[in-house]
UniProtKB/Swiss-Prot annotation:
Listed GO CC annotations: cytosol
Lineage, opening ranks: Eukaryota, Amoebozoa, Evosea, Eumycetozoa, Dictyostelia
Catalytic activity: L-glutamate + H(+) = 4-aminobutanoate + CO2
Pfam family, one: Pyridoxal_deC
Observed effect of gene inactivation: Mutant cells grow and develop well, forming normally proportioned fruiting bodies, but the number of viable spores is reduced to about half.
Cofactor(s) essential for the protein: pyridoxal 5'-phosphate
Position of the signal peptide: none
Enzymatic class: lyase
Binding residue positions for pyridoxal 5'-phosphate: 124-125, 210, 273
The protein's name: Glutamate decarboxylase A
Gene3D superfamilies in alphabetical order: 3.90.1150.160, 4.10.280.50, Type I PLP-dependent aspartate aminotransferase-like (Major domain) (3.40.640.10)
Length: 462
């Protein structure tokens, strides 16, 4: 037998992420240490930590898009170093943004979409605030011309997303929010008009209320404001918060008149990263015309040797989400968006029907006529051994994230809501219902001694 002499230790070059520092000791989480580390080790440690987040596929609480084409990942990688604000440095990205604005203007029935003004934002919240700022500046200018005081502006809304509360606080505006009632969960034309006066800068109906998924009656509110103007002479504009519905109604409910077909609608905001199917970080706001934005709010930047007007609250921000929005417009078209959202709507209807079969739930929203999803509450006389917070908590054992929360102004009413987005199949809906049924059976066999309180179990509903 031959003898071989080993000159070096063959294990000397051994390397493994989990057998090397810092994986073999506690890492510094809250202060920056002196030493550096191998990138692949840190990457693996962070990926492991992210596994503790919920499974996006089973997150039926969020409105944000979580199922993305592989092509979107490629485009996002190509745009990772593009700063959207540098329109002179990235002129083609700026051109793509402009195309998206005109596509949306056309989708939302702007009378002259080629002349429409609008912009991208970091999300629908920023877009909503820009729309609100334009309303305030327009109202203030008119009050100055009339020689009237302009120190007490107000907006009239239904049960709105938190961004409108922030807008009112940050920009010193009174928020007149129509409260929910036991027999009414959204703003009606009658309730809106009750709160309007000469200091109202605008009425803000929501196309897809976050709490119940329902659409508010934009056309009815517009007609009520027309009548109000004839009686009082007050011309009050409408800004539509279409964060979710703006990318659903044009495809699934084209018969609903809510957009620029109504002359009183001066601006609309929408979220590209919700039902626009784009990755997180893109919103849109479109105005009916240039006169609906006060000139003092607009800044000019150099663009292709000329000037481009800009209006935003942010400065540096990534361009990838805008490019991906353009990709989605080209990739899906009207027929694609219709097919995708119709499938989601059908799943929501299926879920609401299955939930109703238990006989212990009142269906607040059955999945028809508005956003894809469903919403329900326990019947007042339901003889059950759990509350909806308990049910949500039990469903988490199987990975499902379902929002349960009390309604604003109605702390005695707890609702549970599922929001259906692209990437959710009928098989997933059936699995959800199977786990839902098993959870209720579990509580029948194992009654809750101490139910989860609303403070402990309140879910994020936006």
């Amino acid at each position: 037998m031959s003898l071989h002499h080993v000159k070096t230790n063959k294990y000397k070059g051994f390397y493994d992420s989990y057998a090397s520092p810092p994986a073999t000791k506690e890492i510094s989480k809250y202060s920056l240490k002196e030493e550096s580390n191998k990138p692949e080790v840190i990457r693996d440690l962070i990926i492991d930590e992210l596994l503790l987040d919920g499974n996006a596929k089973q997150n039926l609480a969020t409105f944000c898009q979580t199922d993305l084409d592989k092509e979107i990942h490629v485009l996002m990688d190509k745009c990772i170093d593009k700063n959207m604000i540098d329109k002179d440095e990235y002129p083609q990205t700026a051109e793509i943004e402009s195309r998206c604005v005109h596509i949306l203007a056309d989708l939302w029935n702007s009378p002259e979409s080629s002349e429409t003004i609008g912009c991208s934002t970091t999300g629908s919240s920023e877009a909503a605030m820009l729309g609100g700022m334009a309303l305030k500046w327009r109202w203030r200018e008119n009050r100055k011309k009339q020689g009237k005081p302009f120190d007490k502006p107000n907006i009239v809304t239904g049960p709105v997303q938190i961004c409108w509360h922030k807008f009112a606080l940050y920009f010193d505006i009174e928020l007149r929010e129509v409260p929910m009632e036991h027999d009414r969960y959204i703003m009606t034309p009658e309730e809106a008009i009750k709160r309007c006066d000469e200091n109202t800068i605008g009425v803000i109906p929501t196309l897809g209320v976050t709490f119940t998924l329902q659409y508010e009656d934009v056309k009815g509110i517009s007609e009520a404001l027309d009548k109000f103007e004839k009686e009082t002479g007050l011309d009050i504009p409408i800004h539509v918060d279409a964060a979710s519905g703006g990318f659903v109604a044009p495809f699934l409910q084209p018969e609903i008149v809510w957009d620029f077909r109504l002359p009183r609608v001066k601006s609309i905001n929408g979220s590209g990263h919700k039902f626009g199917l784009s990755p997180l970080g893109v919103g849109w706001v479109v105005w009916r015309g240039k006169n609906d934005i006060h000139k003092d709010l607009v800044f000019d930047v150099n663009y292709l040797g000329g000037n481009m007007p800009t209006f935003s609250l942010n400065f540096s921000r990534p361009g990838g989400q805008i490019v991906c929005q353009y990709y989605n417009f080209l990739r899906h078209g009207r027929s694609g968006y219709t097919a995708v959202h119709q499938a989601c709507l059908d799943h929501g209807i299926f879920i609401s029907k299955q939930v109703k079969k238990h006989g212990i739930f009142d269906i607040v929203y059955d999945g028809t006529g508005a956003l894809p999803g469903a919403c329900w509450k326990l019947k007042k006389d339901a003889k059950v051994k759990f509350n909806l917070f308990d049910l949500s908590d039990r469903m988490r054992n199987r990975g499902w994230q379902i929002a349960s929360y009390t309604l604003p102004n109605l702390p005695d009413i707890v609702v549970q809501r599922v929001l259906i987005r692209h990437g959710f199949s009928h098989d997933m809906a059936m699995l959800l219902i199977e786990d839902f049924n098993r959870s209720i059976e579990y509580f029948d066999k194992h009654p809750m001694v101490q139910s989860i309180s609303k403070d402990e179990g309140q879910s994020f509903h936006h």
